[in-house]
Swiss-Prot record:
Subcellular location: Cell membrane
Annotated disulfide bonds: C52-C110, C204-C313, C592-C650, C696-C740
Reaction it catalyzes: L-tyrosyl-[protein] + ATP = O-phospho-L-tyrosyl-[protein] + ADP + H(+)
Protein name, per record: Tyrosine-protein kinase receptor ver-3
Residues linked to a glycan: N119, N211, N245, N255, N381, N425, N528, N697
Signal peptide stretch: 1-17
Function: Receptor tyrosine kinase which may be involved, downstream of pvf-1, in the positioning of ray 1, the most anterior ray sensillum in the male tail.
Keyword Plastid: no
Domain Ig-like C2-type: residue ranges: 20-110, 200-325, 565-666, 673-758
SMART domains, sorted: IG, IGc2, TyrKc
């Protein structure tokens, strides 16, 4: 038994060892054809890579075609372009042929050096322009016998497209049977009718392209005396079938020059059922001699299936060797037949995204009858579904089916697959089923489509229905059917892993919990599990050492992702309102539901409608609720208006995904009830004791509630149906005026209808007494209203006098000299003594106020256009300067106007500086009518905080860790700590990254420049002196060229009252405590040193790109946090030296803090050390900005000289004035 097993193993090993090698081609489609085998087509100057692999351990070698006769072949050049080596990873012998040439066309083979019989071949076509391969010699001399006309091709062509001409005469039979793309035409005497081939011009032509020909001169040596015989079967009936009377003749022809002796030759036919008996089923005639020809015929009466087989004709000669020729007869079982003539390669291995086509040429019999039908399909095995899967192929965007008729029953079917549809999952067996009458013929192609790397997929299904859900979120105890599938040709190994929330590394799922599956183009693993906790899944596909991976996350959730709208009616709503319609004044609550399982969710709300895409444009509040497996982010919309109409999107994001959950609300505008039909005080005439109805003729939005009154009392004798009062019986008391009161949340409206009841009994005088009383009440009400209006007029007059007094004292009146004891006070604390410079006064005619661009507690800022007060030319008269126009929120509030006037006088007292917002002028003369406008520069970049936040995604960090370890290894500077240094872009040159012109770019050097500019601006204010009191990035403006302006320093004094800077825990009071030192919060003491503290906070905002100070500390705990000695941590983009400056600014004792001049010196030294050109460029830009700022006076003052030889007088302002030049602010 052991001996038998040993022998069996040896045989198995020997069988594997003697398996021939196989050639694969990289990057090109390998095709196969019945006549020439495997082949590949290339264009000239591309690269050919062949890989030869074998199962035995012997050496492999490549054999090359004979190319010496090809035009352009050079042996040395071929060797230079050719490279052979072994692939150590897989043991393959690799042949690389670079820059392939047309002359490289031919058969390449790979064989075992130990067993040369083990080999594999592939024919390589290399095409340039010519279809026929150019040869060095076109004169061919052959010996007696068959001749090859060597019209080889440089690409694979259909045989029927190549024609052979001999002396310009078409050789018709040559193309059908005797052409091979590798060698050319095989010429026999049967094909060529001339007696001898002597210096004949043969020409090969390609029918599909003009001028594609090849010409050869072929000559024949003189034939010997033994030649001249032609022995063959005569062509018989092509469609033999059961019941047909069939005959087949064998001929021997002599065309030689000698005398033919027929008696020396004998022909006979042999077959299993052959007989010389005339009555037999298969009868063979005796041979007949006619001239130089001998023939014998086999005759079969009523063909049967058993007559199929080999029929042999035997030629016997006295002086020659006996010769044989065979004819293979196939008897079809039916008359209707289909024969496949030619197909495109039936085994195909191609690359993805390369167009391909499948073609079959066939003939049908009898073709006079009904035509054929054809059906294309694809059969493949799926790793998911059991059994073979079939797909019927039709014409669509990916595949095209075409049919061609050649006549005489010959046809072709073609399936073209477009390049973008050629993917690995389209592999399989492609089947063409041809039906003709009662016969079916099937042609198959095995198509394997290789991909560069496996396509790995994780699919989650519900097991009972196999419905693909592929969601991330599932409720606990859900049964899941999870597939890890790799779509790959060649096949790849699959690994399925998982990781729970509590584990750090992925680990393989236990094999006994997995089911292995496979198909034509895919392999995979199936994991059936009951979902209990969140997990990460990883599916890996490994092929030739390369790994493709996909990861999926399954999260536990109690509720699905959704937005739930909830609608609460206004307290003013009436019971008649439709419950589902949202009206102005209602409250809406939008609840965004998302998972609790993960902590890295970022959830926010977006809002969009036709007018706005910013949710800050509408007042909202948010709150968060935590459920068992979910979180709820609730957006509260209170007292909604039509501006709330739009789409609300809850944006739920984490590192891997983003979900947009949308809902829309439509807020209907409300309108007070109004009369819509008929007239007020209409008259309705009714008959006593009869039915009548009256219509209120009023409507509103929402639909109002209707109440009816008669003689001042509610009317209770009828039924109210909407706006109609239905009365079943008219009474005498119904005579008179009815009142209808329509009420909704927008208000109410009263309408009166007079009802006249005919034939009613006379009533009492009570009604007239009631009218008299009503008239008396009306007179009293008019008297009271008159008194109230007179009181209101007195109040308005008092405000008018107060505003005029304010103007006289604050603007027009110039106070005396400043007392000595007040000279050291900040400028904002001595505003009474500050003069208002009338040179700043702007004529309202020159100022056009546009849309609002910002607002605060006390003032509102609008964009404006300023015209020149004293233009020197027509162009200047039509030029407009964009400006910012500030006014109070209530122009008739004396206290607010006083604050505005004080701010104006403070700004007048501060000289222009490129880092301080400049005053252009003001409108003060109409303060009595509420017109007090402060006109400043228009800064196009907005406030600094929003600017920094907007550039977070595009920020360029120029701060890196120093790779050099410091020498000093003290406890202050340990070697383990690496310092941060600047690394500016070397391509741009040193320091040139500063203030780049691209507004979308922001880098570390820009942050340094911004910090220096704020220090310069605050130092300028400190020299006035002026204490800002509210320095923060929100109060710093920035231009698109990254020049900053300190703003809102004029109103700072008004915040010293304790209603603004109190520390009471009230969320309704704005408290900038995150920017203030303790002495400001607790003692309300504001100095330049408190501004320095705020400057340090500003630096923190800058280097966190708009971050909030003390981010992990609640607002109400900030004071205690600071008091305990805690400070902000060092920002990521902040240099160590900058952070040291911040900490000095945050010293508890104000005396220990630096001055702003100290801060300027620090920044200049720091920037100078970082870059030799850095500081210089900043100073140059600020100098240019100062020059531009000084030109602002030209817009309101007559300080410029007239234009020479130009006389111009400003025309009166028109209602519609042409403005063809708008000058943007230099900022």
């Amino acid at each position: 038994m052991k001996l038998k097993l040993t022998v069996l193993l040896i045989l198995v090993h020997a069988s594997a060892s003697y398996k021939p090698p196989a050639i694969e081609v990289e990057d090109y489609q390998v095709q196969e054809h019945d006549s020439i085998g495997k082949f590949v087509e290339l264009e000239e100057h591309t690269r050919l890579i062949l890989k030869c692999s074998a199962h035995h351990n012997g050496d492999l070698k490549y054999n090359f075609p004979s190319m010496e006769g090809n035009v352009g072949y050079d042996e040395n050049n071929f060797k230079k372009r050719m490279e052979e080596y072994y692939d150590d990873a897989f043991g393959d012998k690799v042949l690389t042929l670079n820059d392939v040439r047309e002359s490289d066309t031919g058969t390449y083979s790979c064989s075992s050096m130990e067993h040369s019989s083990l080999n594999d071949t592939i024919y390589v076509f290399v095409h340039r322009k010519k279809v026929f391969l150019p040869l060095k010699s076109v004169m061919i001399i052959y010996k007696q016998g068959e001749v090859m006309v060597p019209c080889k091709t440089t690409k694979f062509v259909d045989k029927s497209d190549i024609e052979l001409y001999a002396s310009n005469v078409l050789v018709k039979e040559a193309s059908k049977y005797n052409y091979d793309q590798r060698y050319g035409f095989k010429i026999t005497k049967k094909l060529y009718s001339e007696k001898q081939i002597v210096d004949v011009n043969f020409e090969c032509r390609y029918k599909k392209e003009e001028n594609q020909t090849a010409t050869y001169i072929i000559t024949e040596k003189e034939a010997s005396s033994d030649d001249g015989y032609h022995f063959s079967w005569e062509k018989g009936f092509q469609w033999p079938h059961v019941g047909y009377n069939f005959s087949l003749t064998c001929n021997l022809n002599y065309n030689g020059s000698k005398i033919f002796h027929g008696y020396t030759n004998k022909l006979s036919i042999e077959c299993p059922q052959c007989s010389h008996d005339p009555g037999s089923h298969v009868h063979v005639d005796r041979h007949r001699i006619i001239g130089n020809k001998i023939s014998t015929t086999v005759r079969i009466q009523h063909l049967e299936l058993e007559d199929s087989g080999k029929y042999t004709c035997i030629w016997e000669h006295e002086n020659k060797e006996t010769k044989y020729t065979d004819y293979h007869l196939y008897v079809a079982p039916k008359k209707a037949q289909i024969k496949v003539i030619e197909t495109s390669p039936t085994i195909m291995r191609i690359k993805e995204n390369r167009a391909t086509s499948l073609t079959a040429k066939f003939a049908i019999y009898p073709f006079e009858k009904e035509s054929y039908t054809a059906k294309w399909s694809r059969i493949y095995n799926s790793s998911i579904h059991e059994g073979p899967q079939s797909e019927t192929i039709i014409n669509d965007d990916f595949r095209k089916i075409a049919a061609t008729s050649f006549g005489d029953g010959a046809f072709s079917e073609n399936l073209d697959i477009k390049a973008f549809a050629v993917s690995t999952n389209m592999s399989g067996t492609y089947v063409l089923s041809i039906s003709h009458m009662d016969t079916v013929q099937v042609v198959q192609w095995e198509v394997a489509i290789e991909n560069d790397e496996p396509d790995v997929q994780i699919t989650v299904r519900e097991p009972s229905s196999f419905f693909i859900s592929n969601q991330e979120y599932y409720k606990p105890d859900t049964n899941l059917h999870i597939e890890c599938i790799s779509i790959s040709i060649p096949p790849a190994d699959v690994v399925f892993e998982y990781k729970t929330k509590n584990s750090e590394q992925f680990q393989e799922i236990e094999p006994n919990k997995l089911v292995s599956v496979g198909g034509t183009f895919d392999r995979g693993l199936i994991y059936n599990v009951t979902f209990t906790e969140g997990m990460d899944l990883k599916c890996s596909s490994i092929r030739k050492g390369n790994r493709a991976i996909t990861v999926n996350k399954l999260i536990k959730i109690g509720e699905g992702f959704e937005v739930r709208p909830h609608h609460e009616k206004s307290s003013k709503a009436t019971e008649s309102e439709p419950s589902k319609i949202i009206y102005e004044g209602d409250n809406v609550k939008l609840t965004c539901v998302f998972p609790l399982d993960s902590d890295d969710w970022s959830v926010s709300w977006r809002f969009e409608n036709s007018k706005s895409s910013d949710i800050s444009s509408i007042p909202t509040t948010t709150e968060t609720e935590i459920k068992q497996y979910s979180k709820h982010l609730i957006l509260n919309l209170r007292d909604v208006t039509t501006s709330f109409t739009g789409t609300y999107t809850c944006v739920v994001k984490n590192e891997d995904s983003e979900k947009l959950l949308e809902t829309s609300i439509d807020v209907k505008a409300i309108s007070k009830p109004s009369i819509t039909g008929g007239n007020s005080n209409a008259v309705v005439i009714v008959d006593y004791d009869q039915y009548f109805e009256i219509n209120c003729n009023m409507t509103g939005t929402p639909p109002p509630v209707y109440q009816w009154f008669k003689d001042g009392n509610p009317y209770t004798h009828g039924d109210v149906d909407g706006s109609i009062l239905r009365v079943s019986r008219a009474r005498g008391e119904d005579d008179g005026e009815f009142h209808c009161l329509a009420t909704n949340r927008a208000g109410d409206k009263l309408n009166s209808i007079e009802v006249q009841v005919n034939n009613a009994p006379k009533g009492s005088l009570f009604f007239y007494w009631f009218l008299a009383l009503l008239l008396l009440i009306s007179i009293i009400a008019v008297f009271l209203l008159t008194c109230k209006l007179r009181a209101s007029n007195r109040l308005t007059k008092q405000k008018d006098i107060a505003l005029n007094t304010l103007y006289e004292t604050m603007i027009k009146h110039q106070a005396g000299p400043l007392p000595e004891e007040m000279k050291d006070l900040p400028v904002e604390e001595r505003t009474y003594y500050l003069p208002y410079n009338n040179d700043y006064e702007i004529d309202p005619v020159n100022l056009e106020i546009l849309n609002p661009i910002g607002s605060g507690h006390f003032g509102v800022v609008k964009k404006g256009l300023l015209g020149m007060a004293y233009p020197k030319s027509k162009i200047e008269s039509k030029t407009r300067l964009p400006v910012a126009v500030k006014s109070s929120t209530n122009p008739f509030n004396v206290e607010l106007q006083k604050m505005m006037a004080e701010e104006l006088k403070v700004m007048c007292a501060i000289p222009k500086n490129p880092n301080v917002l400049a005053l252009i002028g003001a409108v003060t003369k109409n303060m009595r009518q509420g017109q007090l406008y402060i006109v400043t520069e228009f800064i196009d970049g907005g406030n600094l905080r929003e600017f920094l936040q907007a550039h977070r995604n595009t920020f360029i960090n120029e701060l890196v860790e120093d790779e050099h370890v410091p020498v000093d290894d003290s406890y202050l500077v340990p070697n383990s700590v690496k310092k941060k240094i600047y690394k500016f872009d070397e391509k741009l040159g040193e320091g040139t990254r500063l203030l780049v012109e691209d507004p979308d770019a922001l880098c570390t050097s820009d942050l340094l420049s911004i910090g220096l500019q704020i220090a310069k601006g605050m130092a300028w204010l400190a020299d006035v002196p002026c204490v800002h009191r509210d320095l923060a990035c929100r109060n710093v403006l920035i231009t698109k060229t990254k020049i900053v302006r300190i703003a809102d320093f004029g109103l700072s004094k008004k915040h010293t009252n304790k209603t603004y800077y109190r520390t009471k825990k009230s969320k309704d009071t704005p408290l900038p405590v995150r920017w203030m030192p303790l002495e400001c919060i607790e003692e309300f003491k504001f100095t330049q040193k408190s501004d320095v503290w705020s400057f340090g906070i500003c630096l923190y905002e800058i280097f966190t790109l708009g971050g909030t100070p003390y981010p992990n500390c609640d607002t109400f705990n900030v004071i205690e946090f600071i008091r305990n000695g805690n400070r902000n941590k060092q920002p990521e983009y902040c240099h160590d030296e900058i952070y040291e400056l911040m900490k000095v600014c945050w010293q508890f004792n104000p005396k220990d803090r630096p001055t702003f001049n100290d801060c300027i010196t620090f920044f200049e030294n720091h920037m100078r050390d970082s870059s030799s050109q850095f500081l210089e460029r900043v100073e140059n830009m600020l100098h240019t900005e100062m020059q531009e700022q000084s030109k602002l006076d030209d817009w309101i003052q007559d300080s410029r000289p007239d234009v020479p030889n130009v006389s111009f007088q400003k025309s009166p302002k028109k209602q519609k004035e042409e403005r063809y030049l708008i000058v943007e602010s230099h900022a």
